[in-house]
Amino acid sequence: SASHVEIPLFGINLGTVGFLTEGEITNWQTIIDRLLADDYSMQDRMMIRGTVRTGDGKECRKRALNDIVISRAGFSRLIGLDVYVNGSFLNAYEGDGIIISTPTGSTGYNLSAGGPIVDPMARLMIITPVCPHSLTSKSIVLPSDAKVSIEIAKKRKTQDTEAIVSFD
């Protein structure tokens, strides 16, 4: 929610992986000293924007540094998602959902779902299906200026007709 302010972020690894974090919590004093001494470099990371349109016409617009995830609302059913890129149909996915990831987010949920790790300074997006009910569903890498549209497919009664969208 603070993405429009353009305040630099500094990642500190509090867990066990920390692919893109610059510091470890055990070195917090050194980190603070370097920041106060202007002894650091900055990287401009790509963000993605998304718009959620509900059935009753409401819209919600947000930005994400890591990813936008569309997932099923129910626990026991698949969700069908039709994906379009620049207005052209790309694929129909059935599964637990879809991740639209930035290069920064490629080492997070995207990686856990089997997606590729990409250079954090690259200008691209990754679409990765989450637990696809298919033998051939793989991640797709797109240019950063591609317009991705996703619609809930209503092909079978056993599919969810609602989704949960998260911006990270």
Which positions does each model-derived feature cover?
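Structural signature of FAD isoalloxazine-binding scaffolds in flavoprotein oxidoreductases
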Residues: 36, 119-120, 127-132, 141-153
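Short aromatic-centered micro-motifs
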Residues: 83, 105, 165
